[in-house]
Amino acid sequence: MGTDAGANIALHVGLRAAECGDNLKPLQIKGLILHQPFFGGVERTPAEMRLANNKILPIEATDLMWELSLPAGADRNHEYCNPMKGKVAQSLGLIKEKGWNVTTTSCGGDPLIDRQKEVEKALEEKGVTLVSKYVDGECHGYDLLEPSKAELLMCALKDTVHISR
């Protein structure tokens, strides 16, 4: 499980664990929870353009965060940022092979939502059992700003645990 950039890390660690086959036993992974993942890319999406001046997550801030965190010389189409590029996109089928479920959360006021939905679509195309939780109008990280609004995350956790049993 991961929130924001932690969701990106959870996806990458999950895929690496899936590649390990049975070498991680007795550890049993049942699924991944990607809470408002921090995906990006070089080409601007409609949501990024529409919400470029978002008060919580303006596009200049996301660009700067990626510039500071990606490997030297990499752009925002690096697989750490854009999971639809590189090895990650081809590896999503491993999640299905392992029988894992994936739960995602997103919100309509998030400039990153188009990329989140793109990854959800790719997972569904690979046959992965996906539970997608969506809140209209809220911004990226809204539940951190107002913890009383963390219900979406709690529902996602509950549903993922319930499905994975």
Predicted features along the sequence, with ranges:
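Alpha/beta-hydrolase superfamily serine-hydrolase fold, recognizing
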Residues: 1-165
